């Protein structure tokens, strides 16, 4: 991904039970994505029509944060068709957790086996982790898709999503 990226994960983990740095191995019970379930099951059981994989990337020395090594000002919008069902997969190639948030639509998190697990607005992706979720593009317009660590968002870890 070029100069905007200072590391890349070859074998990302797919586990959802990692509480994150500083909380592992302390003997505490920590709520993780693996513990969460949405009552009633998957609100939209359709299979995804397409897959989008985005790498969470950055260069800590240069304080650049990006998706696929591309900062917001150099990126193109992601286009979703109205009512399309998609699978978005994040691969975190950085040393930090990133709480990723898509405005206007829900993120239906999948377990490592691909089964629906929980509906969320913000999905935390731990370092060296791969997390997939399904999205139903049911909100027309232009939407923000960004890291909720606002300084990461401001430094480029942001994409525009267009549903049209």
Short names for language-model regions:
Residues 1-164:
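Copper-binding active sites and cupredoxin-like electron-transfer domains
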């Amino acid at each position: 991904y070029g100069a905007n990226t200072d590391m890349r994960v070859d074998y990302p983990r797919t586990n959802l039970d990692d509480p994150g740095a500083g909380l592992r191995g302390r003997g505490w019970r920590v709520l993780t994505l693996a513990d969460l379930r949405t009552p009633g099951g998957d609100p939209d059981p359709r299979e995804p029509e397409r897959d989008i994989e985005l790498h969470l990337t950055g260069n800590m020395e240069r304080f650049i944060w990006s998706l696929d090594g591309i900062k917001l000002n150099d990126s193109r919008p992601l286009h979703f068709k109205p009512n399309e069902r998609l699978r978005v997969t994040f691969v975190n190639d950085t040393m930090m957790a990133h709480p990723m948030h898509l405005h206007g639509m829900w993120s239906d998190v999948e377990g490592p086996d691909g089964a629906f697990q929980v509906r969320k607005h913000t999905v935390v992706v731990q370092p060296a982790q791969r997390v997939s979720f399904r999205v139903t593009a049911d909100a027309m317009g232009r939407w923000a898709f960004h890291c909720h660590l606002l300084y990461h968002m401001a430094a480029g870890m942001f994409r525009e999503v267009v549903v049209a």
